[in-house]
Amino acid sequence: MARVKTGVVRRRRHKKVLKLARGFYSGRRKHFRKAKEQLERSLVYAYRDRRRKKRDFRRLWIVRINAACRLNDLSYSRFINGLKKAGIELDRKILADLAMNDAAAFAKIAEAAKKAL
């Protein structure tokens, strides 16, 4: 049986890795072994940070809501409790957007939360 060389398969595999390594610095873009190692790390970071992004945004929204609540003489926890008692079902993303872009509307919501307490 004739010996099979991996020329075509290797070329495809290397091209696939080097294509994904575009944008990396120096040898991590040009050399297959370095590119492959960096690509593995990069994919791990990407997987981890897709989950972390959800936590980070939630924290950011809470900070923004808390800052707006304090301008309306209310703490964040009391504000959220008041919203639940008032039956206002707005998520934190929407509340944070209102706090940043429409302070008057947020003040009305804060008043409704205060009354429900």
UniProtKB/Swiss-Prot annotation:
Pfam families: Ribosomal_L20 (PF00453). GO terms for biological process: ribosomal large subunit assembly; translation. The keyword Hydrolase does not apply. It comes from the Bacteria. CDD domains: Ribosomal_L20 (cd07026). PANTHER family: 39S RIBOSOMAL PROTEIN L20 (PTHR10986). Belongs to the bacterial ribosomal protein bL20 family. This is Large ribosomal subunit protein bL20. It comes from Campylobacter jejuni subsp. jejuni serotype O:2 (strain ATCC 700819 / NCTC 11168). The gene is rplT.
